[in-house]
Design a protein with these regions (language model features):
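Catalytic active-site module of serine/aspartate enzymes centered on a nucleophile-bearing elbow/loop
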Residues: 79-113
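Mobile cap/lid helix-loop segments that gate and shape the active-site cleft of serine hydrolases
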Residues: 1-29
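Catalytic histidine neighborhood in serine/cysteine hydrolases
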Residues: 56-78
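Hydrophobic alpha-helical scaffolding
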Residues: 23, 41-45, 79, 83
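A structural signal for short secondary-structure junctions
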Residues: 30-34, 47-48, 60-63
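Conserved alpha/beta-hydrolase "acid-adjacent" motif
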Residues: 44-54
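Alpha-helical scaffolding segments of alpha/beta enzyme cores, especially the outer helices
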Residues: 54-57, 95
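Short beta-strand/loop motif that positions the catalytic acidic residue
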Residues: 33, 39-41
C-alpha cells in the first residue's frame, strides 16, 4: 500500500507522499454535498482513523447527511478498504444503501434471512 500511495503522489517514500497529499482536503467542498454520504474505514487502517473522523466531524458541522462506520478487528474488515474481509465492506455499503432508499430487504426473494 505504501508503495502504491508513494507512486500515486509521485513521492520517493511514504513520508514524501504524505507531505504531497496534505493539500488534498474536502474542506470547502464537502458541505456542498446534497446526497447522503457514507464513510467506511477500518479501525486498524494503516493510514489511521484521525483523517476520517475529522472529515466526519466537519461534515456533521456543515449539515451533511453523513454516516461513519469504523470496522473493528473483532468483526474483521479493520484493514485499509477492508482488505482483510472485503465482504464486510460490501455488506455495510449495500445495507446502508437499502436503508437510504427505504428497501425492506426481508421482502426480497433472494434475502437469506
Amino acid at each position: 500500500l505504501a508503495g502504491h500511495i508513494s507512486w500515486v503522489f509521485g513521492g520517493r517514500n511514504m513520508a514524501e507522499a504524505a507531505e504531497k497529499a496534505k493539500p488534498f482536503k474536502l474542506d470547502g467542498v464537502l458541505e456542498k454535498m446534497k446526497c447522503p454520504y457514507l464513510i467506511i474505514n477500518g479501525g486498524a487502517d494503516v493510514l489511521g482513523v484521525e483523517g476520517v473522523t475529522a472529515m466526519y466531524d466537519y461534515a456533521v458541522k456543515h449539515g451533511v447527511n453523513v454516516t461513519l462506520r469504523l470496522t473493528t478487528p473483532d468483526e474483521t474488515g479493520a484493514d485499509h478498504c477492508q482488505h482483510d474481509n472485503p465482504t464486510l465492506g460490501q455488506e455495510l455499503m449495500l445495507d446502508w444503501l437499502a436503508d437510504i432508499f427505504g428497501i425492506d430487504q426481508s421482502t426480497l426473494a433472494f434475502y437469506p434471512g
